[in-house]
Structures are given as structure tokens and as C-alpha cells.
């Protein structure tokens, strides 16, 4: 039995290194295969230089950090392993039961320590490789031309140098501690450190070696204190961000003293360890710790409580100003022009007629109901899916129109027959778009279309010549095109229409090596064995547009809402906004994720058919993008090179204005005293439990001659519901990117969205109608409440949708309009406006609020009331509850007139 166990043990000992070697080789092969497939992808998209630059940076950073650790640790282990100590042959403490004596352990010391240091070097190298962007930033850094107001460093130091210095500091400390720990372990094994009954006995050679490491570590700690002084500029001081009075007059001074004192204390500690004078050794770090606690923790609290708190406004004013200036720069708020908006309620029917383009482009269709409606009317087959609806503007039949557009993508989860050939060779792409106006409604309450169906039927001068969507938001799987199997294009009544890919996207499958590579990458032997794949075939992967652009440019932050446009040639192109950002701008207030600097510097375009990607520079003044341009000179193109037909569809990002609005609500106050007292703090209105979001519309801005596409968001004063201002970002050239804040008089009440919402909820007629619809089994869905500035007045518009149930088809059945004290609900926007402003006679409809008295006599009014009552009773018997409710509303108005 014992012999058998011995043989098993010998076999394990023999094959264990082989298993490790095989595992390492397999991991290496897998890594190289992925690396090669990534290179093929970058080569296909024309960005191979980005791949090589990134690869060199990651490799260089990994070798630098890992190599430094391995070299430093090996030098220290070499010194430790050369040392000779007595007492060889004695059992190690705690290892006697294992049968390990010191001689055996000493022989294992070198290989084990080598292995451990190699593993630690791999860890450090991996951490270093993750800092490749910081390394490239440092190597290509630029000056901004603006210095921080406290230390006087150029802002470029914080953006491009400090991140790498922080990483070097952290890795340096880890390297020194790793060397000290491994050297200590070797000394213990070799007998340089003994555990005796009287305590720990440390040989003189060991003490000298560790003393040197302690001195080096003290220098690393001092460097850390030096870098920590810069981080004071990111401090959260409650009322503002950045270094304040206490930071400047206590913590900054302490960090500077500690930076100078810590190396001296480290030298004292090293000398104490070298000589074995432990009191001297412990005194030095005790002084540093005491000074740190006193200057960083204790004294700042005392200073804050007894000096700053009673005089905070006076003492913190210059630092508040620093915070205001930096935050306005960080979020590009300086470009926002503030304009007074002297609102009135004098809007007339003539004004409505003069702003016809604005009225016709008020968005009545909400994204969620429209997406559900599109899905039920235009999905065509279960394997097609509408993922999102986007806003844009086009010249449609000669009119500048806001439209809603949704791509019809392929949903692999809903394929009727799931097998490899169907999923990878036949069903390869989505097909076409659904495209319609934002405000037009059919008699049934359904959206109208400019482009619909498969193949695309265009009811306007918008033509889609290349409707296939190979690259989209739902294209998460690889496909192989140009095979012997025809691709499915679209269904017809007589059968399916097929197609063959004619684009240049994807990687050619022109060799056995590539087939083997992708078979391994996607873990299927079918790619290697399929006879349908020829040398002309191409494999399309990274087809999800979000994944695609993030793979190419992971250093950019991309918007979560790509939108599809139709260019002049009828091709479908995705436009995705890209941002540069940083967490390192001094004194700037951060977002929740830590970002305190952001610019929309890049517009990304992806062709939905061939997957080609272009990055266009939309903000050439952004210093971070300038550094990216130095790192990747072939990545970005000037905005002037973007085709003119695509530039017409560039829009100001919803996400960016949302961020800027959140900051501008506070940082429009540029006077430190007003800022400190929050005298004019704004908020983004909240309806229900959700804050309003910016929305696109076409309108004529005050003082402008023509309508334009804008992004708009209102503000209310803090903890109040009336309007304070509205923010607008312009989207059309040549005014693109200009932002205005139109402010209302503070001494007048201007109804805000929440107040209008409350009035709608309290309106007896609207409540009655909602109740009637509910009793009939319909679900009423109130759409977004929009504020529409026209001339010097404000209109509020809210659509009302009806659905048979939660899964039913939403129909736009009513439009609610509020103006001043008037509130109406009608079947469409035109009728609602006619009820308020007059003009063409509208059908009898609901209206509430102040209206002009008629000259009718009481007898005439009484006859009219009786007539309306009889009509209402007839409608009630017929079960026409909607018309019945309208007649009751009209009766209510007549009775009110009679009462007056």
C-alpha cells in the first residue's frame, strides 16, 4: 500500500509541472488568437495604427511596472540569499510536524522566491498595463494655459501628469513592501531572524538590509504626501468644492512639512534599525504620525469650528469663486448666454398663424407609446424588433419637419427556427426604418408615416436605397456573408426575397488559418467544417455599434442613445455622440461618478451596411481631444470632412445638456455671496417621481427670424413650482452648440410644469373623461408635458393616449393645451388651439378657465342649455360616453354664464 502511494506521489510530482506548462501554453495560445482577431478587426475598420499604439502602450506599461518590481525584488533576494547564518539543520518554527528542516527550506528558497517574485511581477505588470492611457497622456501632455489658483500648476499637470504619478506612487510602495516581505521571509528561513523565548533576534546583516528598504519606503511616503497636497483641490467642503480656508491654512502647510520631514524621519528610522537602537527607530515615525494627525485631522477641525464657521462667508469667498470659475469651465457653462424673457399672455390667433412651423412640429407622440405602436403596426414579422425611437429633422416635401424614426432590426431571440445556418448564414440583418411626423394623427389616433413597410414605401421625398441593417443596436452576434447560402432579405405574400451582401465590411475568410482562428474564437467547429463558406465569404463581428466604437476608442465615453439617419444617397448611418472627460480638474464640482470635466468633442458615424466608422472633431478647442489627437493622429477627422448631408443631422446631445443643466441650476450664480446663500438656486422640474428631461423641438427663438431645431429644458426656483427660466441648445449650423438661458422676471408668477400638471389633475371635465374611459376598460396614458415658447408667451401641451389594456395599441385620442389661465382638451392640437385663440370654428369641446362673455340674453342661454341637455341624454342612451362628457362640459359653461 505504501509503495502504491509513493508511486502515485511520484507520478503527481512528475506530471504536475507538465500540467502547469500545458495550462500556460493554452492560455498563451488563446491570448494570441484573440490578439490576432482583434488586429484583423482594427485592420478591417482602417484603425490598425490605433491597435498597435494601444498594444505598445499596454505592453510598455506592463513591462515597465512588472520589470521594475521583478528587478528590484530580485536584487534584494540576491542580497538575502548570499547571507550566511549559523543554526542550519534546525526545524523551522511550526514546521517540525511537516518534517521540514532549515537546510531543506534553504535549498527551496531561491526557486520559491523566484516564483513568487515572478507572480508578483505579473500582477504589477497587469496593473501597469491598465494604466496605458495614463502613460500615453503623460508622454503626449500639453499645457492648458490656465493655472490652478492655489499652487500655481498648469491645469494640464492635473489632467495629464498627476494620474500617472499617482499610479507610480502606488506601484512603488507595493514594490518596496513586496521586496521587504520576501527578503524578510528568506532571512527567516536562512536563520537571520530567530524567534526565541526572549523575543525576536535579528542579525546585523538583516537589520542593515531592512534599514535601507525602510529609508527608500520613507521617500515613497514623502512623495505620497507631496501628491496628496494637489488632491486638496478636489476636496468637498459642503458649500463648495476645492480647497478652502482650512485646507490652505492647515492641511496644505502640513503636507509640505511632511514632504520635507518624512525622508528625515525615514533616515532616523533606518539609522535606528541599522544600529539596533529601537527607541530612536520608533521615535521618528511617531513624530510623523503625530504631525499628520495634528495637522490633517485635529487642527483643521478646531480651525473650522472656532474661526471659519463664525466667519465662513468672509473667509471662504475667494475659494467659492475658484469653485464657480472652475466648474463653469469644466462643464462649458461659460458659453451659456443669459437673456431676459419678459413673458406675457397676449398671444393671438395671428401669432399662432405666424408660428405655424413651430405648431406643426410640437411633438405629440411620446417615445414609449410610439415604440409600442410601431412594433404592432410595422414589425411585420416576429423576428423584427424596434428597439428605440429617435428624434431628428428633415426637409420633407419642402417643409422643415421634426420626425420620429425607428430602425427595424433583427432579433435573434425571436427567430422561428434556431440553428447555426439560420442564425449565422441566412438571417444576417435587419431591414429598413419606420419614419413619420411628430404631430400628425390619423382619424383612428394612430401615427402617420413618411416611410413604412418592407420593402420601404416612401410617402415623401425621403428615399431609402440601402435598407439593410448589418450593424445596429441589436446586432450582437457574428454572421458570415457571401456564402453559398442566400441571405434572407424580407418576406412577401408569394415567398421570401433573398440577397447577397455587396459591402466591404467584415474580415475575408480566405485562408484555413482564419477559419481555424474564428472557429476557436467563437467556439464552434462549424466555421472550419462548413462547405458553404468560401474564399469570398466574409465574417462580420463586433456588429453591435456600441461595442464596435468602444472597441476602437475605449478612451472616449459614448452616448447611450445612437440615432439613425438617412443620407442623400439613401444609405442608413448611425450617429453617436462621443465625449472626453476627466475627474482631475481642480476646484470643479464632480458628478456622482467623479467626472468634473466633459466635452462633446467627437461625432461618430457608423455605416449600417458596411460597418465603416468615422470620428469627426466637433470641438477642436478641447485640450483632452488634442492630446488624443497626438496619441492617435490617424483616428480623428476635421468636422469639415463630414458630408454636408450628415452635418444637417448633427444635434446637441440630450445627455450633455442634461448634465450642463444640472450644474447650471446652481452655477448660473456667479456672485460668491449669492452662491453661498443659494439666493437664486434653480431646479429641474419634477413630474410625479421623475425629473423632466430635455426635449427636441423646432421653433423660432426670441429675436430670431426663422425656425430651427433646438433642445429645450425648463427650470423652476428651488422648492417652488413656478418657472424661473428655460435653457435651449441650438442644433442647426451655423449656430450649432450655442446655448441660451431665458430668465423670467422674479417678481411675477409664471406657471411651471408641476402647476399645470396639478391643474390638469384637478380639472373636473378631464377627470370625468378619464373616469369614463377607465369604466369602459381603456387605459389612459398621459404623455410628456411640453413647454413651448411662442413669441413672448408659453404654451403647455400634453398628449393623451388610450389603450385597450396594458398590451393594447396606444392611440392618441386627446391633446391638452394650457395657456395662461385657460385649459382645454380636444381631439387634436388644432382644435385645442382654436378653442383658446379662436379662428376657424371648432367642434363643441371642453374648455375651462377664463373666457369672454357672450352678449346672449338669459332666455337664449336657457334655451341653449336645454338643447345641450337633451343632446347629452340622447348620447347617454346611445352609450357614447365621450360625446356625452363633452356636452356636459358645454352645459357647465352655459350654466356658469347664466350664474354671472
From Swiss-Prot:
Alphabetized InterPro entries for the sequence: UPF0182 (IPR005372)
Subcellular location, principal: membrane
Annotated Gene Ontology cellular component terms: extracellular region; plasma membrane
A Pfam cross-reference name: UPF0182
Membrane spanning stretches: 15-35, 60-80, 112-132, 174-194, 210-230, 257-277, 282-302
Membrane topology (UniProt): Multi-pass membrane protein
Family: Belongs to the UPF0182 family.
Name of this protein: UPF0182 protein Ppro_3567
The organism of origin for this protein: Pelobacter propionicus (strain DSM 2379 / NBRC 103807 / OttBd1)
